């Protein structure tokens, strides 16, 4: 199998891609950010209806941009879990229907497996075994990739995901949704050492801390209390103010350092020389800087997906369909 049609509708992006080997011939992404930003987050029912309205035109556009037709397609893949149930149903129904009509083999693809494979699209030297730091709006995990389709979760968040923490802190700072890009932008102009914020740690029953697990709820609460203190002192938090930029920078620095420290420790403990990053937070500039510096001192390698493959997209689902199945 060399050429696949892939569909991704797990949350608020309707994406259809055609992938040949590791070459992305088309990758259509219809974002719903402008719709959901009004509500401060994704509304599941609204997301499902939007997917339903544009899925057919996204499929047609993918074929046009790839300059292919159905006889050129060898198989179909679609995200099957995890995600919003109604949103997933739209993509799965479309994919399965097309598979029946055009007599193409169909495979359901796990969304997180897609993020793991996203790095393959732009980093052909990536081969198992390696450690994947998967950081998104719904998940934060350290995954030992032993082989294609063979995984072991070594660490994960015990509460909020990293991307979710970015969204919640952005809401506290009145920056809107989604929080990741705007915090990253403001942090570049702020002082990352302005505020001391706690790095989340998971205590073990016998004492000490879990070396690979994450926690962001305490950090989020610390930012909330900091914002309340500033407002009680009569200061208004504005998106362009220096204090808002400093909070954004301090928060982002704390998250990036925590993610980096655990990823490096995990890779060293398991004798894994390569760390691959996946998920929307993989686009964060501070995380990329911290990891790039850290691997140099430990003789490790870190590989990032292209920025266009960090957020949800069907190309990564197509890559799983080709490489992993």
From Swiss-Prot:
Binding positions (substrate): 134-138, 167, 180, 184, 284
Cofactor note: Binds 1 Fe(2+) ion per subunit.
Keyword set includes Cell division: no
Enzyme Commission number: 2.3.1.234
Spans through the membrane: none
Keywords on record: Acyltransferase, Cytoplasm, Iron, Metal-binding, Transferase, tRNA processing
Annotated positions binding Fe cation: 111, 115, 312
Catalytic activity: L-threonylcarbamoyladenylate + adenosine(37) in tRNA = N(6)-L-threonylcarbamoyladenosine(37) in tRNA + AMP + H(+)
Localization terms from the record: Cytoplasm
Gene Ontology terms: biological process: tRNA threonylcarbamoyladenosine modification
Pfam families with a match to the protein in the record: TsaD (PF00814)
Enzyme kind, highest EC tier: transferase
One term under GO cellular component: cytoplasm
CDD domains: ASKHA_NBD_TsaD_bac (cd24133)
GO molecular function: iron ion binding; N(6)-L-threonylcarbamoyladenine synthase activity
Cofactor: Fe(2+)
Keyword Cytoplasm in annotation: yes
HAMAP family: TsaD
Described function: Required for the formation of a threonylcarbamoyl group on adenosine at position 37 (t(6)A37) in tRNAs that read codons beginning with adenine. Is involved in the transfer of the threonylcarbamoyl moiety of threonylcarbamoyl-AMP (TC-AMP) to the N6 group of A37, together with TsaE and TsaB. TsaD likely plays a direct catalytic role in this reaction.
Family: Belongs to the KAE1 / TsaD family.
Protein name, per record: tRNA N6-adenosine threonylcarbamoyltransferase
Organism per entry: Trichodesmium erythraeum (strain IMS101)
Record lineage: Bacteria, Bacillati, Cyanobacteriota, Cyanophyceae, Oscillatoriophycideae
Gene name linked to the record: tsaD
């Amino acid at each position: 199998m060399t050429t696949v049609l892939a569909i991704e509708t797990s949350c608020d992006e309707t994406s259809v891609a055609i992938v040949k080997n590791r070459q992305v011939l088309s990758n259509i992404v219809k974002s719903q950010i402008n719709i959901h930003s009004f509500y401060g987050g994704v509304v599941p029912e609204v997301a499902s209806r939007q997917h339903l309205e544009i899925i057919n035109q996204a499929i047609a556009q993918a074929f046009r941009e790839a300059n292919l037709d159905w006889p050129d397609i060898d198989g179909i893949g679609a995200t099957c879990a995890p995600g919003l149930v109604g949103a997933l149903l739209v993509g799965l129904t479309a994919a399965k229907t097309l598979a029946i009509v055009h007599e193409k083999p169909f495979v359901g693809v796990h969304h997180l497996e897609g993020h793991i494979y996203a790095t393959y699209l732009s980093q052909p030297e990536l081969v198992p075994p390696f450690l994947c730091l998967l950081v998104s709006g719904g998940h934060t995990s350290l995954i030992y990739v032993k082989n294609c389709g063979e995984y072991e979760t070594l660490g994960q968040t015990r509460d909020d995901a990293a991307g979710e923490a970015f969204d919640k802190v952005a809401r506290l700072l009145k920056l809107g949704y989604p929080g990741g890009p705007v915090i990253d932008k403001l942090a570049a102009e702020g002082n990352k050492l302005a505020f001391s914020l706690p790095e989340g740690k998971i205590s073990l029953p016998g004492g000490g801390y879990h070396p690979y697990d994450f926690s962001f709820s305490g950090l989020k609460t610390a930012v909330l209390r900091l914002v309340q203190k500033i407002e009680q002192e009569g200061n208004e938090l504005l998106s362009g103010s220096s204090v808002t930029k400093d909070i954004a920078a301090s928060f982002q620095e704390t998250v990036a350092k925590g993610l980096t420290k655990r990823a490096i420790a995990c890779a060293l403990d398991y004798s894994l020389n390569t760390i691959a990053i996946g998920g929307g937070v993989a686009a964060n500039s501070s995380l990329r800087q911290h990891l790039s510096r850290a691997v140099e001192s430990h003789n490790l390698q870190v590989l990032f997906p292209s920025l266009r493959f960090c957020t949800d997209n069907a190309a990564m689902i197509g890559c799983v369909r080709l490489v992993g199945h």
